[in-house]
């Protein structure tokens, strides 16, 4: 019986019709893709689909992957699927980055303590799916191992980190006997292939952050936006060089493509407190509450699911056509764009390997005119906030509606509709669903300060707030 490790890196990315490199690449030019890393495309025959999730451990899959350097060590959990029958020999590496997510000048031994063998995903960290219509292998790994008496994984420094998962080129094929726990090895001729990379942050609480979300007082932003105000109280930490060494990041709903960074304080109080309370650059569009649905039970369709059936041996889920939410704000409960994998059809069994996949059809009634040149996408945490061919909608002229069919794993999902130009230079998240100052959003604040003694950007403060 395989032992499954728990960790809180909840990863879900879109299920691909063809394989592609999965890595974090964001639109903010200040946050460049990590340097000195070469990616090679993954052949279609090797990997056909993904489910990726990342967050703190202890089952808190909805939280941002942020953990403290000292104190309560939550650890991390990495969980993802590869849609195939065979178990692969996978490894990971962890890279320390600066405030701009560029590789820092530190060597590995300076920022992490770990044994070489702990960088592997062995057979115990992989589980083939249980009698699902779409076969897959679920990979789950904890850092450190949950319940371990001796920590096998220790962060030595705070700051930004990137975790890369790569293929060693070894496949473990299951024997014909389904009850057999033995595996045979087949070595595949291939270079190291980086499958994806994800961001996380290790924090220190060296300063106190007091923050709030307010309605902007500027007329042009009052009805559709939200503003962050903040104080950084040093409590003895030397912030005297804040003008060049301090770096502040505001993030909306756990998205690294929705950030405001580089904000400077408006003034400094007598005790050294940095005050950020009148900055027009700290304004986010409020957006709207997310659309949501669940199909955790494949035998019962619950609104807004209209129909659940099977086609060519696979489950199909038809969602009720979405209304245009742009007209007025309506308060609804959501997960701020996130998702949860849930399987009510197999109680008591590990959901990571029991939940099935289904082709989910989205429909958006929309009267398109000659001026509509932008493409429309189904967008959310389920596909890592990416605009890809897999979540791009097609327009049905006869029915006057946008349509998309996306392969998803059983669970509860949030999503929205986004418009984008072909070159992605224009991205509009509010034209279809609207934007309102009342919308409930979650904001996270990261405060970095350059450490000259060790030559790296420390994360000296972290705060999560909601409006």
Name the predicted role of every residue range.
Residues 33, 38-98, 220-234, 347-363:
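Contiguous beta-strand segments within globular domains
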Residues 115-143, 257-263, 268, 359-410, ...:
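Aromatic-rich carbohydrate-binding modules that target alpha-glucans
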């Amino acid at each position: 019986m395989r032992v499954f490790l728990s960790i809180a890196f909840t990863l879900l990315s879109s299920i691909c019709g063809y394989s592609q490199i999965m890595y974090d690449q964001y639109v903010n030019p200040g946050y460049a893709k990590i340097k000195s890393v070469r990616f090679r495309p993954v052949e279609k025959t090797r990997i056909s689909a993904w489910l990726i999730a990342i967050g703190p451990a202890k089952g808190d899959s909805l939280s941002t992957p942020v953990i403290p350097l000292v104190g309560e060590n939550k650890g991390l959990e990495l969980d993802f699927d590869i849609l195939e029958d065979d178990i692969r020999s996978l490894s990971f590496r962890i890279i320390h980055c600066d405030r701009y997510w560029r590789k820092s000048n530190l060597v590995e031994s300076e920022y992490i303590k770990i044994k070489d063998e702990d960088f592997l995903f062995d057979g115990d960290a992989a589980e083939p799916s249980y009698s699902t219509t779409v076969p897959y292998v679920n990979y789950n790994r904890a850092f450190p191992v949950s319940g371990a008496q001796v920590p096998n994984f220790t962060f030595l420094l705070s700051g930004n980190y990137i975790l890369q998962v790569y293929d060693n080129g070894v496949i473990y094929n299951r024997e014909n006997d389904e009850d057999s726990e033995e595996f045979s090895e087949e070595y595949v001729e291939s270079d190291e292939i980086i499958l994806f990379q994800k961001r996380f942050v290790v924090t220190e609480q060296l300063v106190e952050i007091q923050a709030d979300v307010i309605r902007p007082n500027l007329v042009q932003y009052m009805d559709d936006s939200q503003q962050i105000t903040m104080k950084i109280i040093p409590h003895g930490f030397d912030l005297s060089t804040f003008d060049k060494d301090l770096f502040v990041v505001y993030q909306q709903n756990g998205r690294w493509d929705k950030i405001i960074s580089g904000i400077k304080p408006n003034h400094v109080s007598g005790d050294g407190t940095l005050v950020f309370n009148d900055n027009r650059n700290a304004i986010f569009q409020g957006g709207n509450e997310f659309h949501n649905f669940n199909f955790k039970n494949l035998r019962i369709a619950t609104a807004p699911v209209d129909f659940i059936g099977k086609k060519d041996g696979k489950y199909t889920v038809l969602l009720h056509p979405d209304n245009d939410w742009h007209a007025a704000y309506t308060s609804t409960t959501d997960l701020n764009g996130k998702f949860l994998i849930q399987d009510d059809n197999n109680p008591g069994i590990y959901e990571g390997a029991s939940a099935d996949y289904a082709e989910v059809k989205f429909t958006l009634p929309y009267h398109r005119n000659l001026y509509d040149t932008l493409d429309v996408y189904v967008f959310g945490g389920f596909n890592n906030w990416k605009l890809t061919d897999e979540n791009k909608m097609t327009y049905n002229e006869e029915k006057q509606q946008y349509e998309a069919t996306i392969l998803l794993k059983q669970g509860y999902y949030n999503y929205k509709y986004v418009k984008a130009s072909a070159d992605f230079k224009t991205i509009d998240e509010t034209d279809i669903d609207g934007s309102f100052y009342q919308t409930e959003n979650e904001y996270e604040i990261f405060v970095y300060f350059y450490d000259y003694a060790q030559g790296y950007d420390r994360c000296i403060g972290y705060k999560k707030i909601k409006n």
